């Protein structure tokens, strides 16, 4: 029999309640929206607080109580009255808790964030399904750009980003997963730059993500719009680096190790690779694990089946141009499944 969303959420809830019991935590309060949505199984945009005692309670504002009762019927819904009520007897909080809330806590407490982070790093079947859908949506936008490059060359960056975000919205994205990076020319030499009213020219970098039912995608493509040998050389080096990473991406490799492998592949160009190789994706577009050579030994993570990560090598030539190619992957025991499937241009 197919599991309902309530069955899936109850499994997550039971795992967290067992953790609380093992740690001697009697009452945990969760305020971070992404952590709440993890236990809800759906995107809930309104104010809410999730409280775990012997069972979980979702506190919402008066305006949202009817909606919450209809959509989250596997939880008891309560109307928010006061922070004193929420935190009374609380002994488990997130590390992100603002200092202003501490005045409501009258006993020693433990940090629960590491457990939630550990749970969220390994995606279950329902999460993978939603991430795949988000990736499918951003693929549609990337493929539109690829198939309409002649038209794109006549647009400004503002006009193109509007078209891209419209396509994603039309196909079910709640919102962009982050501020869309749609830039051309010298601005591509900055890993993170915002679109402007400039006309698209020479080289185009598109880094976008969709959000479907709260779950994110992340994909980058670079398009060469003129015949330039240096651009081709750098582009193909980045493309090959991505393939090198794919050869090593599987359960058992460490986050730091796979970054270092790509950095060494770049050889004389590795100083131009100025960011980490990738990051986890789920309810947040940037979450654990980080694939970075800067991780300390106690921060390094062994990749496991069920993790969803990006691989995004890039090289950036100051005052000239930059190239980045990024895809989204589900880690498996003996390899991976590529979740983003938009075509990659070859030059």
From Swiss-Prot:
Please list the residues that bind Mn(2+) 2.
Answer: 207, 218, 326
Amino acids binding Mn(2+) 1: 218, 279, 312, 326
Asked whether the keyword Translocase is assigned, the reply is: no
Q: Name one GO biological process term.
A: proteolysis
- Coiled-coil region: none
Disulfide connectivity? none
* Keyword annotations: Hydrolase, Manganese, Metal-binding
| Top-level division of the source organism's lineage | Archaea
What does the note under cofactor report?
Binds 2 manganese ions per subunit.
The family annotation for this protein states: Belongs to the peptidase M24B family.
Under which name does UniProt file this protein?
Uncharacterized peptidase MJ0806
């Amino acid at each position: 029999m197919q599991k309902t969303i309530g069955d899936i959420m109850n499994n997550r809830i039971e795992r967290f309640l067992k953790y609380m019991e093992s740690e001697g935590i009697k009452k945990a309060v969760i305020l971070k929206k992404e952590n709440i949505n993890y236990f809800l199984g759906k995107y809930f945009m309104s104010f809410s607080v999730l409280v775990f005692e012997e069972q979980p309670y979702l506190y919402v504002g008066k305006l949202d109580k009817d909606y919450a009762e209809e959509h989250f019927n596997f939880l008891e819904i309560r109307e928010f009255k006061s922070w004193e009520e929420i935190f009374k007897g609380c002994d488990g909080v997130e590390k992100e808790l603002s200092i202003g809330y501490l005045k409501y806590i009258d006993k020693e407490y433990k940090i629960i964030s590491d457990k939630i982070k550990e749970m969220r790093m390994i995606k279950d079947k329902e999460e993978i399904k939603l991430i795949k859908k988000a990736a499918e949506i951003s693929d549609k936008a990337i493929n539109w750009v690829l198939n309409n490059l002649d038209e794109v060359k006549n647009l400004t960056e503002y006009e193109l980003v509007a078209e891209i975000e419209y396509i994603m919205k039309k196909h079910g994205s709640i919102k962009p997963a982050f501020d869309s990076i749609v830039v051309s020319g010298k601005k591509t030499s900055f890993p993170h730059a915002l679109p402007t009213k400039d006309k698209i020219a020479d080289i185009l970098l598109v880094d976008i993500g969709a959000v479907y039912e709260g779950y994110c995608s992340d994909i980058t493509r670079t398009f060469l719009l003129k015949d330039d040998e240096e651009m081709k050389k750098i582009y193909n080096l980045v493309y090959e680096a991505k393939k090198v990473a794919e050869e090593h991406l599987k359960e058992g490799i460490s986050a730091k190790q796979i970054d270092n492998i790509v950095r060494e592949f770049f050889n004389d160009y590795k100083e131009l690779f100025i960011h980490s190789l990738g990051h986890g994706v789920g309810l947040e577009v940037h979450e654990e694990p980080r694939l970075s050579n800067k991780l300390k030994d106690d921060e390094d993570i062994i990749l496991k089946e069920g993790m969803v990560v990006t691989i995004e090598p890039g090289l950036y030539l100051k005052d000239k141009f930059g190239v980045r190619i990024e895809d989204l992957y589900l880690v498996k025991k003996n390899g991976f499944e590529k979740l983003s499937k938009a075509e990659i241009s070859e030059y």
